[in-house]
């Protein structure tokens, strides 16, 4: 489905100190191999996705950050009916790691993922590669601002997007999904 606008973003809006705090906080937990699919159908597939993840369960200050940006973008752009928020995912991409084109939407009743929030936590001087790209119908679209630390993007969850392989260093991101009743 095409949306107008296809995404909403804030360039380097989250302070570096907050990004660094989230990175350090995330490092205090044990991450696991990322999977593709959802819930019970989740599986490891290194041809599609290779990274480590950890879910921040009930970390209110982190939930508040992603919630704020989702609400602002949704009110400004789409006005989707949102009824809940999943746990934010802290993602670590090391050299050779990536996530190929995919969408975040889920169609599991009674709610579905409607909006995705992605935040680049990393200083762009600490990694190479790891480009966030979207498929808006004309092939890969690169939003260069997503390379900057603290940049936030919100987009409809059925939008195809990917992170290209990191070639050097480590890229950290925070992703969150907001859900609601099925579209009518």
Segments from the language model and where they lie:
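Catalytic core of non-heme Fe(II) oxygenases with the double-stranded beta-helix
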Residues: 67, 71-184
């Amino acid at each position: 489905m095409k949306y107008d606008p296809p995404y909403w973003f804030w360039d380097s809006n989250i302070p570096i100190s907050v990004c660094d705090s989230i990175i350090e906080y995330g490092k205090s937990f044990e991450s696991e191999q990322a999977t593709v699919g959802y819930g019970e159908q989740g599986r490891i597939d290194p041809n599609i996705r290779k990274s480590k993840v950890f879910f921040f369960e009930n970390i209110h200050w982190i939930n508040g950050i992603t919630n704020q940006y989702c609400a602002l973008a949704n009110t400004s752009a789409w006005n989707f009916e949102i009824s809940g928020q999943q746990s934010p995912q802290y993602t670590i991409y090391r050299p050779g790691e990536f996530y190929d084109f995919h969408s975040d939407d889920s169609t599991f009743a009674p709610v579905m993922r409607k909006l995705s929030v992605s935040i680049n936590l990393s200083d762009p001087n600490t990694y190479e590669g790891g480009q966030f790209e979207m498929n808006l119908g004309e092939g890969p679209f690169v939003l260069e601002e997503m390379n900057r630390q603290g940049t936030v993007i919100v987009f409809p969850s059925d939008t195809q997007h990917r992170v290209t392989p990191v070639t050097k260093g480590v890229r950290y991101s925070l992703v969150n999904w907001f859900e609601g009743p099925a579209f009518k």
